[in-house]
Amino acid sequence: MNAWEQRKLGAYLTVSKNRNVDGEYDKSDVLSVSGDYGIVNQIKFQGRSFAGASVLPYGIVETGDVVYTKSPLKANPYGIIKTNHGKNGIVSTLYAVYKVNNGSNGIFVEYYFDDNLRLNKYLKPLVNKGAKNDMKVTDENVLKGDVIFPSFPEQTVIGSFFQELDQLITLQQRELEILKIMKSTLLKAMFA
């Protein structure tokens, strides 16, 4: 593939049909997709499982898979697209799970769609919203939109760069919190 040429997202991702039919995963393995935190364990993130009576039809999500959630969020009325960086698990049938094709980088895909404007512009023509604000789009149709991706080596470099930048931001945020606590403690001690 030539770099930076317009192609369908389906050139980079394929719909995963892996289901939990063997019961390999249970309710403790159910994952949710968060706009802020990505793909997370539902119980750890929300305090409980919202899974149905049976998780056998749920889709299996492996590390590196890309997931599209058909749930509207304030900044993303057509849903969000995230890559699983954590443990394997399962998602409700309301989610679409995609395998990353050879020559594609799942981390890059996530960062490509990290920009709300780009994500919304991509999904809007593909998604029909129902009367109850639910998403009317097949897993396959999500792959029919146009994207412009670089070559695989460039995708890898770009994805790694933004991952490192996110890690640096996280470290700086922790340092900021420590400094705020220190300031508060010193002010209390000074004026006690």
Residue ranges and their predicted role:
Residues M1-N20:
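Non-catalytic DNA-recognition/assembly elements of restriction-modification systems
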Residues Y112-K132:
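Charged, low-complexity intrinsically disordered regulatory segments in eukaryotic signaling
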Residues A53-L117:
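A short beta-sheet element
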Residues G10, N20-G52:
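DNA target-recognition patches
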Residues N88-L94, K129-P153:
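A short glycine-rich beta-alpha junction/loop motif
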Residues M1-Q6, G145, S151-A192:
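Amphipathic alpha-helical segments with low aromatic content
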